[in-house]
From Swiss-Prot:
InterPro entries linked to this entry: RNA_pol_sigma-70_dom, RNA_pol_sigma-I, RNA_pol_sigma70_r2, RNA_pol_sigma_r2
Cellular component, GO annotation: cytoplasm
GO biological process, one term: DNA-templated transcription initiation
Phenotype reported upon loss of the gene: Cells lacking this gene exhibit normal cell morphology and growth rate at 37 degrees Celsius, but cannot grow at high temperature.
Organism in which the protein naturally occurs: Bacillus subtilis (strain 168)
Protein name, entry field: RNA polymerase sigma factor SigI
Length: 251
């Protein structure tokens, strides 16, 4: 009997087939889930390696983190929100590995402090230098995580015919206008039927949305690109971009 996955890959294009496989897994097909993870181990290792900047063996802790993250991506993936499973999985894997590295760095710093306590002035100076080095490393890790979020966000924007440059050029200039646009986006995602229109047709349901919000149709249409982008962020697996939303709403 041929493996379930090899049969699935005969159904059509790879992306469509992968989505079918994920749909089956999310309905409880554990055998297929194990096969899919096994097949994509090279992808997982490559993604983890891009973060760690070294060769990754399956015995490495970082690979195990990547494996868990890939499995999480399979369970959380929703094709209606745009972009491919692999793009989504790449974001989740990199984020989880970066979090792991950050925790390991913090643990190493605590050990360093314990070892250096009670030592002379020279040792204290070494400790300060070590702490500064770890802080710089953390900043680099955070910058990498922000960059990965932006790259994934750009891929999602592309599904809606938008670019990051267009978004910057078409963002509302005033804080209150940005706040209103974000509230419109929040209203949209709260209504499943409107969110479904956005996800499937890649268009803003302006007519239906107009009846639910306190801003005019003209305002909705003028801020269409920004509202779509905010919907992507609200419903997406973003950390730093959601902080941006909170910052706008509370400014």
């Amino acid at each position: 009997m041929k493996p379930v996955l090899s049969l699935l890959f005969k159904l059509g294009k790879k992306k469509q087939t992968l989505e079918k496989a994920v749909e089956s897994i999310q309905k409880g097909n554990k055998d297929l889930q194990n096969e899919l993870i096994q097949q994509y181990k090279p992808f997982i290792a490559k993604t983890v390696s891009s973060v760690c900047k070294r060769y990754i063996d399956e015995k490495d802790d970082e690979f195990s983190i990547g494996l868990i993250a890939f499995n999480e991506a399979i369970e959380k993936y929703s094709p209606e929100k745009g972009n491919s499973l692999l793009a989504f999985a790449e974001l989740i894997i990199k984020r989880k590995v970066i979090d792991y590295i950050r925790k390991e760095a913090r643990s190493a710093q605590n050990i360093n402090i314990d070892l250096q306590e009670g030592d002379d002035q020279e040792s204290s100076q070494s400790l300060i230098e070590a702490e500064l080095s770890i802080d710089e490393y953390r900043r680099q890790i955070e910058q990498e995580q922000r960059r990965e979020e932006i790259l994934y966000f750009q891929k999602q924007l592309k599904d809606y015919g938008l670019s990051f440059k267009e978004l910057l050029e078409n963002s509302p200039k005033h804080t209150d206008a940005r706040q209103n646009a974000i509230k419109v986006a929040m209203t949209l995602v709260e209504h499943e039927e409107l969110a479904a229109i956005l996800y499937t047709k890649k268009q803003l349901p302006v007519k239906q949305l107009e009846q639910l919000v306190s801003v005019s149709r003209k305002t909705i249409e003028r801020n269409r690109k920004y509202i779509i982008a905010m919907c992507i962020i609200i419903t997406g697996d973003y950390i730093y971009l959601k902080d941006y939303l909170k910052g706008v709403l509370h400014s």
